[in-house]
Amino acid sequence: MNQRLSALVNGGFLSENEAHQLMHDMMSGSLTDAEVAASLSILAHRGETAEEMTGFVRAMRQKAEPAERSLDVVDTCGTGGDGLSTFNISTAAAIVASAAGAKIAKHGNRSVSSKSGSADVLECLGIHIQSTPEETRRQIQEKNMGFLFAPMYHSSMKQVAAVRKQLGFRTVFNLLGPLCHPMQAKKQIIGVYAKEKAKLMAEALAPLEPEHVLFVCGEDGLDELTITANSYVIELKKGDMTEYTLNPEDFGLAKGYLSDIQVQSPEESAKLIQNILNHQTEGAPLHITALNAGAALYVAGKSESLMAGTLKALETIKNGAAKEQLARLKQKTKEEEIYA
């Protein structure tokens, strides 16, 4: 039996280095499916420690395909798994934030359990998702936003894909994805489906010295800053960790209903996003997009506070800049036309 797995079976905890080696073994295909399943099951049952998570993240980052790491970018992504079937809020927020001057490197995938993954809705919006690393870098520099399609950068995940599908329950990989940005983005908005997992992820990321990251979790269970209730926030900024609760009404945003932001398909999500960016939709969809875009602008250093960022995001939508940015993102480059 694998030495690290043996420690888990016997009720032990792994050091950061041991966790790093276990994840390296998983990603390298040197464990049997049974050993992978046992490791994931034990961790899911007893819960991962922050030290173990840090080791896992280091290993996954090392196994990721090379990507540009010199750009000052922000990622807006989440763990998913909230089961609430909302439209792609973080994707809409990314477009608005990029229209307002933030450089966004959106890391995402197709849907696993939701109605619409970020890759799915971007395709419906007419935005190319399978760009090369070099093309993505150019998109970020020239258009303020590029998409990093997760399977293109985390090919070693195929070693555990079958086991994860067979297990059918959440595993540590649901938490690791947002922490393993291919560009190793130092600025992020990370949505988390549960408050205790947000704390775990923050404690795991802190030793890796991020510049400015917000972990957000709605009291309604949404893995975003929500508009239907208060949101729990953990802020990591240059080594300091603070926790607070955010009430959308403090930002002048009336609380809405989940039913106002739920969709049944990527096509429906894309239509709602277009309406938001065209400023043809008011209420909860507009407000939740602005709130999350405002957070991205705050983390990017384009606004001095969450409040200022939210107001800037609203103005970006109202003055037509967000609509123009969507049109710009749809324009194909020569390279994209060749591979289309």
UniProtKB/Swiss-Prot annotation:
Locate the residues binding Mg(2+) 2.
Answer: 223-224
Tell me the cofactors it needs.
Answer: Mg(2+)
**Sequence positions that bind anthranilate 1:** 78, 109
> Would you tell me the Gene Ontology cellular component terms?
cytosol
Matches recorded under SUPFAM superfamilies: Nucleoside phosphorylase/phosphoribosyltransferase catalytic domain (SSF52418), Nucleoside phosphorylase/phosphoribosyltransferase N-terminal domain (SSF47648)
Q: Which GO terms describe its biological process?
A: L-tryptophan biosynthetic process
Enumerate the residues binding 5-phospho-alpha-D-ribose 1-diphosphate.
78, 81-82, 86, 88-91, 106-114, 118
Which molecular-function annotation in GO is an example for this chain?
anthranilate phosphoribosyltransferase activity
Binding sites annotated in the UniProt record for anthranilate 2: 164
Residues annotated for Mg(2+) 1 binding in this entry: 90, 224
A Pfam family (short name) is Glycos_trans_3N
Question: What domain of life does the UniProt record list for this protein's source?
Answer: Bacteria
The pathway that the record names for this protein is: Amino-acid biosynthesis; L-tryptophan biosynthesis; L-tryptophan from chorismate: step 2/5
Keyword set for this entry? Amino-acid biosynthesis, Aromatic amino acid biosynthesis, Glycosyltransferase, Magnesium, Metal-binding, Transferase, Tryptophan biosynthesis
This entry's Enzyme Commission designation comes to: 2.4.2.18
The family database entries (InterPro entries) matched by this protein are listed as:
Anthranilate_Pribosyl_Tfrase, Glycosyl_Trfase_fam3, Glycosyl_Trfase_fam3_N_dom, Glycosyl_Trfase_fam3_N_dom_sf, Nuc_phospho_transferase
Co-factor: note: Binds 2 magnesium ions per monomer.
The reaction(s) catalysed by this protein are: N-(5-phospho-beta-D-ribosyl)anthranilate + diphosphate = 5-phospho-alpha-D-ribose 1-diphosphate + anthranilate
The free-text function statement in the UniProt record for this protein reads: Catalyzes the transfer of the phosphoribosyl group of 5-phosphorylribose-1-pyrophosphate (PRPP) to anthranilate to yield N-(5'-phosphoribosyl)-anthranilate (PRA).
- Describe its assembly: Homodimer.
Q: Which HAMAP family match?
A: TrpD
Family, according to the entry, reads as follows: Belongs to the anthranilate phosphoribosyltransferase family.
**Name of the protein described by the UniProt record:** Anthranilate phosphoribosyltransferase
Q: In the record, what lineage is assigned to the organism producing the protein? A: Bacteria, Bacillati, Bacillota, Bacilli, Bacillales
